Amino acid sequence: MSISISDSAAQRVSAFLNHRGKGLGLRLGVRTSGCSGMAYVLEFVDEINDDDIVFEDKGVKVIIDGKSMVYLDGTELDFVKEGLNEGFKFNNPNVSNECGCGESFNV
């Protein structure tokens, strides 16, 4: 099982945590949503739960709840800028289908 984070994503998460002034890392999860069934969830973590799986890459802790891990195993979290838009991108090898807008996926 693995989760990785790109250099640009690590820099962005570190900057957000520093600006926020607290936090242990970033929680990455999935929830039921959208036309393809699942959507990614990102949130800052102040506490790690007993069933959480913690990965550390490039100095950033990425926390995954046990239920989401099956959908996220092997995912790389990236931060990209495309024109005037910027945001986190999930390079997930488990995805079999995405909706047209790219907001939800299926495995």
Curated annotation (Swiss-Prot):
* Listed GO MF terms: 2 iron, 2 sulfur cluster binding; iron ion binding
Residues the entry annotates as binding Fe cation? 35, 99, 101
Q: Which cofactor does it need?
A: Fe cation
Q: Subunit notes for this chain?
A: Homodimer; may form tetramers and higher multimers.
**Cofactor: how and how many bound:** Binds 2 iron ions per dimer. The dimer may bind additional iron ions.
Q: Does the keyword Metal-binding apply?
A: yes
- Could you list this entry's UniProt keywords, alphabetically sorted: Iron, Metal-binding
What is stated as this protein's family in its record? Belongs to the HesB/IscA family.
UniProt cross-references to InterPro entries, sorted A to Z: Fe-S_cluster_asmbl/transfer, FeS_biogenesis, FeS_cluster_insertion, FeS_cluster_insertion_CS, HesB-like_dom_sf, IscA_proteobacteria
Q: Please report the organism this UniProt entry assigns to the protein.
A: Yersinia pestis
Q: Which PROSITE patterns match?
A: HESB (PS01152)
Listed under GO cellular component are: cytoplasm; cytosol
List the GO biological process terms.
Answer: iron-sulfur cluster assembly
Q: What is this protein called?
A: Iron-binding protein IscA
Query: Function of this protein?
Result: Is able to transfer iron-sulfur clusters to apo-ferredoxin. Multiple cycles of [2Fe2S] cluster formation and transfer are observed, suggesting that IscA acts catalytically. Recruits intracellular free iron so as to provide iron for the assembly of transient iron-sulfur cluster in IscU in the presence of IscS, L-cysteine and the thioredoxin reductase system TrxA/TrxB.
